[in-house]
Regions:
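Non-catalytic substrate-recognition and accessory regions of acyl/acetyltransferase enzymes
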Residues: 1-122, 130, 134-153, 157-204
Length: 204
């Protein structure tokens, strides 16, 4: 990504900085503005940490993160191992089976991510992708706990779908989540999100 951004990312204790923020997706904007049952309540209950992205002091994006645990199956393992860029960072020989024997893997979940409408409407602006890269760097710098994956419940509705955006950022559907999605869809309960993951940290 060639564009450079002059931005500042800072923790926020509440959503007061987002009072004039609009991403242009009605359901998300309503959620941001809803003080009783929306994003602010989610942050106040400490279910997620909110980060504001400022450009020239103006909030142009935000994201909220929490800890997660990612479940993977044998099909997920094959998909991850077959990616050429993962060959040099995954464990090999005797360590591989030990690594893949885990029931779940440490992750950080992107609970929410939104970019202001002005930037979303500009096809040459890739602020969302830049933020994903910044989140990866933040996770890699975390000295308190291991983080190997980013996860997200990508919004996927008739109004808006974030699935293609996350695919372009190298997120994939987990086979475990895909099986659940197919089951719910088959019985008429169409999910509004799709669980996806991204391998982010080399294993040393």
């Amino acid at each position: 990504m060639e564009k450079k951004y002059n931005i500042r990312i800072e923790r926020a204790a509440d959503t007061s900085a987002l009072s004039s923020f609009r991403c242009g997706i009605k359901s998300m904007d309503d959620f941001i503005l809803d003080k009783e049952n929306g994003l602010d309540k989610f942050i106040q209950l400490r279910l997620s940490n909110l980060w504001i992205v400022r450009e020239n002091e103006t909030p142009v994006a935000f994201f909220a993160l929490s800890k997660d645990a990612l479940m993977l199956n044998s099909e997920d393992r094959r998909n991850i191992e077959h990616k050429e860029q993962n060959a040099s960072i995954l464990p090999s020989n005797g360590d591989a089976d030990k690594f893949w024997d885990k029931e779940k893997y440490p992750a950080i979940e992107i609970d929410y991510l939104a970019v202001c409408k002005e930037k979303r409407d500009n096809p040459n602006d890739h602020m969302g992708t830049y933020i994903i890269e910044e989140i990866c760097r933040m996770a890699e710098a975390d000295i308190f706990s291991s983080t190997m994956f980013l996860t997200v419940e990508a919004l996927d509705t008739k109004e808006y779908s974030a699935v293609d955006f996350y695919r372009n950022c190298d997120f994939e559907f987990s086979d475990v989540a895909q099986n659940k999605y197919n089951y719910e869809s088959m019985f008429g309960n169409q999910p509004t999100t799709r669980r996806m993951y991204k391998l982010i940290i080399p294993i040393k």
